[in-house]
A protein has these predicted regions:
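Acidic/histidine-rich catalytic neighborhood
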Residues: 13-72
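Active-site core of glycosidic bond-cleaving carbohydrate-active enzymes
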Residues: 1, 5-9, 13, 55-172
Length: 172
């Protein structure tokens, strides 16, 4: 059985790794260090950085990973790491809406150095992930604002991703 013999062991070990990697900050479990691929931000002093903690992409992937793992545990009737995973999933930070109404790319509401950057990694939770639900109008609106801010520039692969995001928003 693929789920039991192949997928479960790989996903279980990914969960085990991240349970050990997460660190507590501000009452949440966060990834640290963390980046949003190829994008940078300005700190309060106006200095450019790329490394911080709890990027939205990281948190999106972990929410999806942990939820998937818990579903697999129920299907296979196993409970290895189940309680720890349930706890960690509840302790991941919520998605945040930033200063311009966009989905924040990082835990803090930093200013991007390039708002038109081709990467939309912080929208992973909408697509290809599924942790931003169709019923969550506030987050969907924030994703739409993020897409509009980024614009339509980019290379082939990111244009396909943006088109898929628009389709997920039922606006493609």
């Amino acid at each position: 059985d693929f789920l039991k013999d192949r997928a479960y062991p790989v996903i279980r070990e990914a969960v085990r790794f991240y349970l050990g990697y997460l660190t507590e900050y501000d009452g949440y479990l966060v990834t640290c260090p963390s980046t949003s691929p190829e994008n940078c931000f300005l700190d309060r002093k106006g200095e450019k950085h790329s490394v911080t903690f709890a990027s939205t992409m990281d948190i999106s992937i972990l929410k999806e990973l942990f939820a998937t793992y818990l579903q697999i545990c129920k299907i296979l009737k196993v409970d290895v790491l189940e309680k720890e995973t349930e706890f960690a999933l509840k302790k991941l930070p919520p998605f945040k809406i930033g200063h311009d109404g966009q989905l924040q790319e990082w835990y803090r509401d930093y200013r991007e150095t390039d708002i038109h950057h081709r990467h939309v990694s912080h929208l992973y939770g909408l697509y290809p992930g599924n942790v931003i639900k169709e019923t969550d109008q506030e987050l969907k609106k924030a994703c739409e604002i993020s897409l509009n801010r980024r614009g339509s520039q980019g290379t082939g692969w990111c244009m396909v991703w943006k088109a898929s995001l628009w389709a997920r928003l039922k606006n493609g």
